[in-house]
Regions:
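Extracytoplasmic gate region of multi-pass secondary transporters
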Residues: 51-105
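Intracellular juxtamembrane helix-capping segments at the cytosolic ends
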Residues: 174-189
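A membrane-interface helix-boundary motif in multi-pass transporters
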Residues: 1-12, 217-241
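C-terminal ends and interior cores of transmembrane alpha-helices
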Residues: 144-157
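Multi-pass alpha-helical transporter architecture, strongest
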Residues: 16-28, 231-261
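Loop-to-transmembrane helix entry/capping segments in MFS-fold secondary transporters
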Residues: 105, 188-203, 227-229
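Juxtamembrane intracellular "pre-TM" segments in multi-pass secondary transporters
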Residues: 29-58, 90
């Protein structure tokens, strides 16, 4: 199938949601906001002046620099460096139960399938295990898993090691991120939690902005030109380690003496 079918499917899905929005969804009644534009900008400045909050976002963005490699560098690495024959053979061997002579191949789109599939299978289990864990410590554990996942890509190009690295990284993602939201709720002022949670998504802006540019530049330098892919992935592992150290120092020195809301 060509790419046009993928785009048509995406258009159909979006159009279907639009129809649901027009004919099924009804906006719940709620009090009209009394804030004018000046007050909105005043609230924005209030958040941006909170250096503890901004520092939290900046530090946590380090993990999202790693995360956005899943949509760039990991895909290039797969296409250029990984021989997925062992995975293909295993899957096709299983598919012979249902069809004759299957010819399934692991391709770039299946990286997202591994990521999403791991979350679907394990998120409830991970959440149940960590429901009473402290947010900061859990974030550190999650980022450690994410760093380890990318580290596996540095030490081997074997197909199953590649899959294992993706799975471990995803476990780190589902461990760290929910607790980050919880952590923001703890450090935000009691009457500004919703406002702070809204601006907490700046981590994505920083992570994607830096991650995309850095990933492309470093990939060309280390992988394409130098033929040293291990240095490329170790660089991102270093960013993960620095993020962990940053969170520990932030909690030890910046939040010392502060009482969470």
């Amino acid at each position: 199938l060509g790419w046009n079918y993928i785009l048509l499917m995406a258009a159909f899905g979006t159009g279907w949601l639009l129809l649901l929005n027009f004919f099924v969804f009804r906006e719940p009644s709620r009090p009209q906001s009394q804030k004018n534009l000046v007050q909105v900008f005043a609230d924005m400045l209030l958040v941006l002046k909170d250096y503890k909050f901004i520092l939290t976002i900046v530090i946590y963005s380090g993990f999202w620099i790693l995360y956005f490699q899943m949509y760039d560098s990991v895909l290039w690495f797969l296409k250029e460096r990984i021989d997925m024959t062992p995975v293909n053979n295993a899957v096709n061997s299983f598919l012979t139960i249902f069809v004759d002579n299957p010819s399934w191949r692991f391709d770039a789109e299946h990286v997202t399938v591994v990521n999403a599939g791991t979350i679907i299978l394990l998120q409830l289990i991970v959440s149940a295990i960590l429901k009473n864990a402290k947010p900061l410590q859990t974030m550190i554990v999650g980022i450690s898993f994410g760093t380890l996942g990318l580290g596996l890509l540095a030490i081997s190009t074997y197909a199953w090691v590649f899959i294992l690295g993706l799975v471990i990284f995803t476990i780190g993602e589902m461990t760290a991120h929910p607790k980050f939201i919880s952590y923001i709720g703890l450090i935000a002022p009691q009457d500004k939690k919703a406002l702070y949670l809204g601006y907490s998504f700046l981590y994505g802006v920083i992570g994607s902005g830096i991650g995309g540019v850095l990933g492309a530049f470093a990939y060309v330098k280390f992988v394409t030109n130098m033929n040293r892919p291990e240095l490329f992935w170790l660089m991102f592992c270093g960013i993960g380690v620095l993020t962990i150290i940053g969170l520990i120092l932030f909690n030890r020195f910046v939040l010392k003496g502060s009482k969470p809301s």
